[in-house]
Curated annotation (Swiss-Prot):
This is Mitochondrial adenyl nucleotide antiporter SLC25A23. Coiled coil: none annotated. Residues 1-187, 263-285, 356-378, 456-467 are mitochondrial intermembrane. Belongs to the mitochondrial carrier (TC 2.A.29) family. It catalyses: Mg(2+)(out) + phosphate(in) + ATP(out) = Mg(2+)(in) + phosphate(out) + ATP(in); ADP(out) + phosphate(in) + H(+)(out) = ADP(in) + phosphate(out) + H(+)(in); AMP(out) + phosphate(in) = AMP(in) + phosphate(out); phosphate(in) + ATP(out) + 2 H(+)(out) = phosphate(out) + ATP(in) + 2 H(+)(in). Ca(2+) 2 binds at D89, N91, D93, H95, E100. The lineage of its organism: Eukaryota, Metazoa, Chordata, Craniata, Vertebrata. The gene is Slc25a23.
Length: 467
């Protein structure tokens, strides 16, 4: 092993560490001693490190770890750390320097500055050589909560928890371990349930947005309170949830199709590469989103028609589909498809770019202390990036909605995407392309909050472990 430690020396070192942690000297290290010891030694997050140690080697966590169990864990741990050290030591000179740290992050799609790489190195460099040798690496990570450099990406994974009613974002990344253990589908299910609850909770604002996109104009100055009042007067309070059923129903097929398409497209783009760069993720995510939208798009048209329906206009989902087919033909199910697909590029691109920018800014400022930014930072960055994506793609979303609703407006002109854009700009100006954006923004915070709470509870119910 690099570093020249004999087996006897390693066991002596492990024994000394065990004695440090065993504060009551009963020959076992229990959960409380482990937590207190890790906090005292400054070895990362005590909760997560303690979970990793006890889950690996002790059948009875309450009983604590014996010296033998603790030694077995550290032996296996050092072997994994040595493999990680070798993978980061690109030139195999026995030391990790600043440039190798930058290369490792770059391979994961994260761009960090020289100053930030030096901060990371300083946190482990005890002898002031501006490099990290095996002993420094081992001692820093032996009981540290991070398994590898990719844990930084785990914390920053753009999660399905942020469901704000639009499915145009780049899909989530799942590790090989998550795929092999089946955690990936549990996380997708948790995300789908969270999305369903979130969309149901914010359905009145979503219906108001669609209502204002289609009906608001210079001559019909529809505001938020006026729109809600009109809908309640026409169909009662429950009418505020019209169209929500199919909006929830389409979550599962769209998420599944997008995930499968993303994995296949990633494989084709990646080739022999280990990881995808941010630009490649954007291309793969956009193509996967376009694939999913192409397949489920008839459900989008049905959602718009059902959302805008008058009381008694349709008996239900199947009746709506039947009437559209009979009166307008199969092409009606793809009305507005072009602006919808074109909207994926600005939405997913800006969403991903803003998220990566915020992530890199956080890493440059704070990651020398911890790779985990905390849930408030994650939710804040996700909300800001999604909102920026929405602003950029909103005019196309409005044109799409109006085209989907064309046949449901009596005497409404059947115009193309370009024709509709020209009509809106000439009659209402640029602001006309942003009708309904106020209720759209109003639903972002409650949607994100609801989906996060439900997502975390669903993960717990399904047995999804957090690293």
């Amino acid at each position: 092993m690099r570093g020249g430690s004999s087996d006897a020396e390693r066991r002596q070192r492990w024994g000394r560490l065990f004695e440090e942690l065993d504060s009551n000297k009963d020959g076992r290290v229990d959960v409380h001693e482990l937590r207190q010891g890790l906090a005292r030694l400054g070895r990362g997050d005590p909760d997560r490190a303690q979970q990793g140690v006890s889950s690996d080697w002790d059948a009875d966590p309450d009983g604590g770890l014996s010296l033998e169990e603790f030694t077995r864990y550290l032996q296996e741990r050092e072997q994994r750390l040595l493999l990680m050290f070798h993978s980061l030591d690109r030139n195999q000179d026995g030391h990790i320097d600043v440039s190798e740290i930058q290369q490792s992050f770059r391979a994961l799609g994260i761009s960090i500055s020289l100053e930030q790489a030096e901060k990371i190195l300083h946190s482990m460099d005890r002898d002031g050589t501006m490099t990290i040798d095996w002993q420094e690496w081992r001692d820093h990570f032996l009981l540290h909560s991070l398994e590898n450099v990719e844990d930084v990406l785990y914390f920053w994974k753009h999660s399905t928890v942020l469901d704000i009613g639009e499915c145009l974002t780049v899909p989530d990344e799942f590790s090989q371990e998550e795929k092999l253990t089946g955690m990936w589908w549990k996380q997708l299910v948790a995300g789908a349930v969270a999305g369903a609850v979130s969309r149901t909770g914010t359905a009145p604002l979503d219906r108001l947005k669609v209502f204002m996109q289609v009906h608001a104009s210079k001559s019909n100055r529809l505001n938020i309170l006026g729109g809600l009042r009109n809908m309640i007067q026409e169909g009662g309070v429950l009418s505020l949830w019209r169209g929500n059923g199919i909006n929830v129903l389409k979550i599962a097929p769209e998420s599944a199709i997008k995930f499968m398409a993303y994995e296949q497209i990633k494989r084709a783009i990646r080739g022999q590469q280990e990881t995808l760069h941010v630009q490649e993720r954007f291309v793969a995510g956009s193509l996967a989103g376009a694939t999913a939208q192409t397949i489920i798009y008839p459900m989008e048209v049905l959602k718009t028609r059902l959302t805008l329906r008058r009381t008694g206009q349709y008996k239900g989902l199947l009746d709506c589909a039947k009437r559209i087919l009979e009166r307008e033909g199969p092409r009606a199910f793809y009305r507005g498809y072009l602006p919808n697909v074109l909207g994926i590029i600005p939405y997913a691109g800006i969403d991903l770019a803003v998220y990566e920018t915020l992530k890199n800014r956080w890493l440059q400022q704070y990651s020398h202390e911890s790779a985990n930014p905390g849930i408030l930072v994650l939710l804040g960055c996700g909300t800001i990036s999604s909102t920026c994506g929405q602003i950029a793609s909103y005019p196309l979303a409005l044109v799409r909605t109006r085209m989907q609703a064309q046949a449901s407006i009596e005497g409404g002109p059947q115009v193309s995407m370009v024709g509709l854009l020209r009509h809106i700009l000439s009659q209402e100006g640029v602001w006309g392309l942003y009708r309904g954006i106020a209720p759209n923004f109003m639903k972002v915070i409650p949607a994100v909050s609801i989906s996060y709470v439900v997502y975390e509870n669903m993960k717990q119910a399904l047995g999804v472990t957090s690293r």
